[in-house]
Amino acid sequence: MHRGYALVVCSPGVTRTMIDIDDDLLARAAKELGTTTKKDTVHAALRAALRASAARSLMNRMAENATGTQDEALVNAMWRDGHPENTA
């Protein structure tokens, strides 16, 4: 019996990983994220998780800064990424 082998070359910084994913959960995530492929759905979900973590961190900083003082770094962080009013 002959076994076939395939050489898989990934781009730098990319790891090929085989995982079991719940099909229903993947379909629901794809619909929510507006993605059409499994790869795009997983990448979008990972990015969404990182954005959620950053938002939680920012909210914690805002809560700690609720003393009424203006922290310029905090204000800049609030408006920096993707906010149309601050596209500097």
UniProtKB/Swiss-Prot annotation:
Pfam families (alphabetical): VapB_antitoxin
Record key words, sorted: Toxin-antitoxin system
Alphabetical GO biological process terms: positive regulation of growth
Top-rank taxon: Bacteria
Biological function: Antitoxin component of a type II toxin-antitoxin (TA) system. Upon expression in M.smegmatis neutralizes the effect of cognate toxin VapC21.
Protein name stated in the entry: Antitoxin VapB21
Gene: vapB21
